[in-house]
Structure formats: structure tokens, C-alpha cells
Regions:
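Active-site cores that bind ATP or allylic diphosphates and position pyrophosphate for catalysis
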Residues: 1-181
């Protein structure tokens, strides 16, 4: 939401990768259903969001893949592209700011890039924030999310909205495919 506000864009195109995934990833169905719930619950500005899957797969090639996906999104008509701290990297294989350094070496790709470093939750300020060593900073971990579902442990609402958790737990109870095996 911060990126949408800062970019002054007219809307948000949510374009998750829906192709082949690795073991342990959430299934495409769970990812798309989660976004549909967020849209239905008006988490995003009303009538300003489009959801469409990007039928490719992660190559785990860090900065090179960030360039590829940015160009693909530009070709889909996007004016901005968000790049996270470790965009399709493999744990700590790439340096923390390697994406940004790599993009700075290139000429204009004709798409505005929005870079994010490590994000977490500041429990004192009750909002998401860039990484800090503060005791009030709570890290977000995909591994912790997966583990919580395997042990049936509820996550705080700031970590994952309860509507999403409820949907995933229901799918697990229905023996639906939640994680790639």
C-alpha cells in the first residue's frame, strides 16, 4: 500500500507468479484465493485493483530475474515495479542490495522501480517498517508461516490476516493442496 501511495499510480496490478513452484511453497490456488479475499475485504482502495496471474516460474536468479520480471510487467502496461530485498534469490546467495546495484548499471528500463529492504512489524508503532534492531521490531518469515500451519498455531493478525489464515486452515482440513510437495 505504501508503494501505491508513494508512486501516485492510478491503481494496483497484483500479478503473482502462478507457474511451477518449489517444494514448500504455497499452491497457486491458495495465493490467488488470498488476494481475492483481500480485495473482497477492501484492504486495497476500492475499484483500483486488478488481479492477474503471471504464468511463469521462479528461476531463483536474483537480480537477473528481477530485470526479467520488471520488463515483463512493463510489457503488461505497468508503470512501476516493486522489488524486494531478495527478489527470487536463494537465501543469502546474493548480497542484500545486489538488485539495486544491478539495476543502477542498466540504462532506463522505462519502468519505475520501487525497492524495499527487509520489512517487519514495529509493535510499538503498530505498523510495518523497514528493518531495525529495535526490540519492538518483529521479523516476518515464510518458514515461520508454513510451520504455523503445520503445527496449527495461529499467527498474529499483523503477520497474516485472520481471514487468510481461516481460509488456509479450512483448505487443510478439507485435505486440499495448500503447499507444494
Amino acid at each position: 500500500m505504501r508503494a501505491l501511495k508513494e508512486s501516485e499510480a492510478d491503481g494496483l496490478f497484483i500479478n503473482p507468479v502462478i507457474g511451477e513452484k518449489k517444494t514448500g511453497d504455497f499452491s497457486t490456488e491458495i495465493i490467488l484465493e488470498s488476494y481475492k479475499i483481500l480485495i473482497a475485504n477492501k484492504i486495497y482502495p476500492d475499484k483500483s485493483v486488478l488481479l492477474g496471474g503471471f504464468n511463469t516460474y521462479s528461476r531463483y536468479s536474483g537480480p537477473r530475474e528481477a530485470i526479467f520480471t520488471a520488463i515483463c510487467r512493463k510489457n503488461l502496461g505497468c508503470s512501476h515495479f516493486i522489488i524486494g530485498r531478495d527478489h527470487t534469490g536463494v537465501q543469502d546467495f546474493y548480497k542484500e542490495n545486489e538488485n539495486k546495484e544491478f539495476f543502477n548499471k542498466l540504462n532506463n528500463l522505462e519502468i519505475e522501480l520501487i525497492f524495499f529492504n527487509k520489512i517487519g512489524f514495529n509493535s510499538k508503532q503498530k505498523k510495518f517498517a523497514n528493518y531495525s534492531n529495535s526490540k519492538s521490531f518483529k521479523e516476518i518469515s515464510g518458514s515461520d508461516v508454513r510451520a504455523s500451519f503445520k503445527t496449527n498455531k495461529k499467527l498474529p493478525n499483523w503477520y497474516m490476516r485472520k481471514e487468510i489464515q481461516n481460509m488456509i486452515r479450512l483448505k487443510i482440513n478439507q485435505k486440499k493442496k495448500v503447499f507444494i510437495q
